[in-house]
C-alpha cells in the first residue's frame, strides 16, 4: 500500500523549515544507516540529536497527527522522531536500492519501534531539482514518487526502495518510520479502504443513516480485533 498525503505542511511552513535548515550544519548521512544501507547511501543529514532536528520533527508529528488521511492510513502507535536529509547534485548524492531496518531505536528517548511504514515528507518543490525520485518496489512493479513540498508518502518499510541520483539542484526531505497499531499490511489496507468508503458514503447518506452506523461499527470492531496496543 503506497499512499500520498497532501498538505501536511503549508508552503509557509516549508519556507520556514528551509530557512532554518539553510543555516544548519549537515553531516554524512551514513551515520544512521545499517551496515548494508551504508554501502549505497550518499547524502547528508541534520544530526539526529540536534535541537533543530528535534524541534522541526515535533512540528511534523503534530501536523501529521492532525491530518485525518494520515491517521486513517497509518493508524500509528509509535512514530520515530523525524530525520532530515539533503541530496545535492554537486556532490553526486543518491541512495541505492535497500530495505529499511526492521527495528529502529532512538538514543535520546529510548524509544524502540517495529518499522511497519516508512514516511518521506518532501521539503523541496519538484522543479527545484532533477532526479532524486523515490523509487519503491512492490508486488505490482516499480513506482516513482516526487511530490510537492509539504506532501508525504507512506509505504511499507519492507519494500525495496532507492533515491535516484540528483543531477541538478538540491532535494531536501524528512524521513522516518512508524509502528502501526495494525501490524498486518493487508489488514491495514482493508481498514483504510473501509474508512475511506465510510467517509465518502457519509457525505451522501449522512452519518446518522442506520447503514452508516452499522458500517462504522464494523470499522471499530475490526480495529478492536486486529489492533495491538
UniProtKB/Swiss-Prot annotation:
Fe cation binds at residues 98, 100, 161. GO terms for biological process: DNA damage response; intracellular iron ion homeostasis. This is PKHD-type hydroxylase BBta_1313. It is an enzyme of class 1 (oxidoreductase). GO terms for molecular function: 2-oxoglutarate-dependent dioxygenase activity; iron ion binding; L-ascorbic acid binding. 2-oxoglutarate binds at residue 171. Its EC number is 1.14.11.-. Gene3D superfamilies: q2cbj1_9rhob like domain, Rabenosyn, Rab binding domain. It comes from the Bacteria. Binds 1 Fe(2+) ion per subunit. Keywords: Dioxygenase, Iron, Metal-binding, Oxidoreductase, Vitamin C. Its cofactor is Fe(2+); L-ascorbate. It holds the Pfam family PKHD_C. Residues 78-180 form the Fe2OG dioxygenase domain. InterPro entries: Oxoglu/Fe-dep_dioxygenase_dom, PKHD_C, PKHD_hydroxylase, Pro_4_hyd_alph, Pro_4_hyd_alph_FE2OG_OXY.
Amino acid at each position: 500500500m503506497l499512499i500520498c498525503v497532501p498538505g501536511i505542511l503549508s508552503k509557509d511552513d516549508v519556507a520556514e523549515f528551509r530557512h532554518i535548515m539553510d543555516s544548519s550544519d549537515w553531516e554524512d548521512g551514513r551515520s544512521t544507516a545499517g551496515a548494508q544501507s551504508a554501502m549505497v547511501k550518499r547524502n547528508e543529514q541534520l544530526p539526529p540529536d540536534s535541537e533543530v532536528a528535534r524541534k522541526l520533527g515535533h512540528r511534523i508529528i503534530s501536523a501529521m497527527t492532525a491530518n485525518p488521511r494520515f491517521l486513517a492510513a497509518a493508524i500509528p502507535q509509535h512514530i520515530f522522531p523525524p530525520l532530515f536529509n539533503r541530496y545535492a547534485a554537486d556532490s553526486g548524492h543518491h541512495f541505492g536500492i535497500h530495505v529499511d531496518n526492521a527495528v529502529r531505536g532512538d538514543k535520546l528517548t529510548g524509544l524502540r519501534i517495529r518499522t511497519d511504514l516508512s514516511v518521506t515528507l518532501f521539503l523541496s518543490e519538484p522543479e527545484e531539482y532533477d532526479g532524486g525520485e523515490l523509487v519503491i518496489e512492490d508486488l505490482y512493479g516499480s513506482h516513482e514518487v516526487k511530490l510537492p513540498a509539504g506532501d508525504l508518502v507512506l509505504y511499507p518499510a519492507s519494500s525495496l526502495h532507492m533515491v535516484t541520483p540528483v543531477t541538478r539542484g538540491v532535494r531536501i526531505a524528512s524521513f522516518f518510520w512508524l509502528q502501526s497499531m495494525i501490524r498486518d499490511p493487508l489488514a491495514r489496507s482493508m481498514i483504510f479502504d473501509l474508512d475511506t468508503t465510510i467517509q465518502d458514503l457519509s457525505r451522501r447518506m449522512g452519518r446518522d443513516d442506520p447503514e452508516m452506523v452499522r458500517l462504522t461499527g464494523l470499522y471499530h470492531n475490526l480495529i478492536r480485533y486486529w489492533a495491538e496496543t
